[in-house]
């Protein structure tokens, strides 16, 4: 068993967590979490013992969602979306070094494409799981399989949580989008 640290951000109907809510989380198995709230956002910082990161995160999600307080997990942190500055900080490089890797002016090339652009389109964000996978190939001595899997699991769990929220929508637009994209999803998953 290893110890894994992560934060679950969750939504709950109440304006704040009561002592009874905290007791319910504890009784559901959340004794290894520190619960907090800031600006209407609820979170739980877990230090969870488990065989692997997936087991740790899934068991923690189950604690939050089965405690009987109406909580629904919306994401796991640390966040998978990173800027050049975040990549530099997490890899121990300078911003300029990362920029050169991103632009293919240093390293082997093939740096992952940005996942999105924010603001006026100048600020790019990458999926950290993709970046770690690239670094694992580029610098295998610094990035082992376990850290690569850790970030991949967190990214996939977050994607599942986003998809779950979308799948629960029943308005006409959501139904039309799901129906229209189903063939594309089937083609993509068949590859």
Specify the residue positions occupied by each region the protein language model found.
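Short, amphipathic alpha-helical "recognition" segments used to contact nucleic acids or chromatin
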Residues: 68-80
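Short glycine-/aliphatic-rich beta-strand segments at the starts of folded cytosolic domains
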Residues: 1-14
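Major-groove DNA-recognition helix of helix-turn-helix-type DNA-binding domains
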Residues: 93-123
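A short, Lys/Arg-enriched interface patch at domain edges and termini
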Residues: 128-185
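DNA-binding alpha-helical recognition surfaces that contact promoter or target DNA
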Residues: 58, 100, 133
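Short, intrinsically disordered low-complexity segments
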Residues: 31-67
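Polyanion-binding surface elements
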Residues: 77-103
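Short amphipathic alpha-helix segments
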Residues: 11-33
